[in-house]
């Protein structure tokens, strides 16, 4: 389960907003393509399937070929005239990114084909085609396709559609390193994976969604000024250390533990309630509070019907046994050596002061999903 976090400054109590549960498909669940031999027909609601060796899906009266022709027609009608060789390259790139988009829609959201003749969609599509034709950047093309597929899920003019349209125009103005900055800031300041229960799980999570960006971030002040200029975020006066963020979001992973005798010594009437206490992750000779954060601790209190007096005493144990920031940093680097570079850049750059806008969140989110695959729905943060 993922949860949206609201960024906070140092010494400010953490504030969170709950998000709906998300069922993420396991990485081990691979799609198998039987289309070459399987004659079973499928069609989405409002669609018609015609047998032709493989399915030819007609959605809203348009076949895949119809949609492709319409999509390429948008590019032909709008892209400026170039010399013969340059035009050939541009057309080839536009067709490549269009094919990627249509394949993604066919696989993930075929209802999106119904927007082929919508002016707003065509404008967004042309933005993707134009930027990929101009740069030929495969990574940028993949990011723009991700954003446009998301846009097809919002045919009505709502805040999500507006943010995604703006993101399509903004992403091409950024370097790969700046995209990495948005993803790293988004991951640390705006997300919490509530399924993480031990150090191994935290390490695996970071390897999947963070490691691909770690080496790309830099301290260059001009990067952050440009991100601010493009509307992806703001450089504020307040700052927060990466150790502080991790120590709040995943506090339960960074506890030193305490002797079991502390429970009776502090007069906690609930005793060694197994729903509240467990063996310490960092020192098996001790025990710790069984939670990652103050918010989940409150839920545990409610489930176990813990008395008000006991709650304050247990919170005291939770906070008093927390590692120092230097110890948290050392533990993270022990788990993931590439974190050393991130701690260094974060502490000595505007990253610690950077707050994302809705556009920065959308681009950072899409960049993570492009690399990691399955990820939480953007609607958790923008709605």
Show where each model-derived region lies:
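Conserved aromatic-histidine-acidic binding/catalytic patches
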Residues: 132, 166, 170-174, 211-215
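Short alpha-helical segments that sit at the start of domains
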Residues: 157-196
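Long, low-complexity intrinsically disordered regions enriched in small/polar
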Residues: 2-85
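Alpha-helix C-caps/helix-loop-beta hinges
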Residues: 230-231
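A compositional/structural signature marking long, glycine- and acidic/polar-rich segments
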Residues: 6-8, 24-25, 197-207
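Accessory beta->alpha helical hairpin/"wing" motif in late/C-terminal subdomains of nucleic-acid enzymes
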Residues: 138-149, 199, 215, 220-225, ...
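Eukaryotic partner-binding/assembly regions in large regulatory complexes
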Residues: 49-51, 55-168
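Short helix-coil junctions and helix-kink-helix linkers
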Residues: 190, 201-218
